[in-house]
A protein has these predicted regions:
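Non-heme di-metal
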Residues: 2-160
Length: 160
């Protein structure tokens, strides 16, 4: 599903929100995996950041689920959405280092929300959920993802 064009229907918006939910699940799982696998070697500041990133992703997922529930649209089974996320947004496994992987995750999420907002703003469709409320929630999530990109960049620079 492309975000290059405006959102054309409630169904498409529902599917895009579902993609965001799965994307947040991926980000949360990868952060938690890094904490578990790198437990002994992980810098306490990096561990704290990864734990916060996982919590933030869970919060974003909850906000997206609330928006999805407010739409009067058919949804697609999550098992059908997951491959779309993996294909387009999931990080490759060849990143060397926890922080590089987390940077990719944060940037990917930021870019997804930036594209989603543009696709909604360029759409003429009337959604069952208030457009201002919808874009406000998504803009806040996008801003939090941008802050995550900035924070992981700072952590990387501190370790150079």
């Amino acid at each position: 599903m492309s975000l290059a064009r405006p959102v054309g229907s409630d169904h498409q918006l529902a599917r895009l929100l579902q993609i965001g939910i799965v994307l947040e699940e991926v980000v949360e799982a990868r952060a938690e995996k890094h904490v578990e696998l790198s437990d002994a070697d992980l810098d306490p500041e990096v561990r704290a950041f990864l734990n916060e990133a996982a919590e933030e992703s869970a919060d974003h997922r909850a906000r997206l689920e609330t928006l999805l529930a407010e739409l009067d649209a058919d949804t697609v089974a999550f098992e059908d959405i997951e491959p779309l996320v993996a294909e387009r947004y999931e990080a490759d496994d060849d990143f060397d280092g926890v922080l590089y992987d987390q940077l990719c995750n944060e940037e990917t999420a930021y870019k997804f929300y930036e594209d989603l907002l543009a696709a909604i703003e360029n759409s003429g469709v009337q959604f069952p959920v208030d457009r201002e409320y919808l874009t406000s929630v998504l803009a806040k999530i996008m801003a939090e993802e941008k802050a995550g990109v900035e924070r992981v960049t700072e952590l990387m620079e501190e370790r150079e």
